[in-house]
Amino acid sequence: MENFLQQLKTLSSAEDFMQYFGVPFDQKVMNISRLHILKRFFQYLRQETPLAQTDELQMFTAYRALLTKAYGDFVTSTPAQEKVFKVFQDTDGKQHVTLDSLRASMPQRAAAA
């Protein structure tokens, strides 16, 4: 199991994870959603029963299934719809900036420069 965990520590990108676990992926989906996919994957991992008590093959299989599930979420949906990150949760996908707030920020920016 230690070997499996050490190998995971060497992975640095979403593509690295997908390749390591043998999950086929569309690069277009990865270009748009790579951070969202990894965040969802780690959310799924946290929801699972403790996996550290199983052997490496069971862990690999469970991790692969969760990564595949996370990737699938973004094949059929968008990051804004999935609301993985706080910015999407708080604004419900909408942004609202009033002209008054823009005007108020202008002199502050000019003075700061």
From Swiss-Prot:
Q: Which UniProt keywords apply?
A: Nitrogen fixation
Endpoints of the signal sequence: none
GO annotation terms (biological process): nitrogen fixation
Q: Name one Pfam family in it.
A: NifW
Which InterPro entries does this UniProt record tie to the protein?
NifW (IPR004893)
Calcium: present as a keyword of the record?
no
User: What is this protein's function?
Assistant: May protect the nitrogenase Fe-Mo protein from oxidative damage.
Q: How does it assemble?
A: Homotrimer; associates with NifD.
What the record says about family reads: Belongs to the NifW family.
Q: What is this protein called?
A: Nitrogenase-stabilizing/protective protein NifW
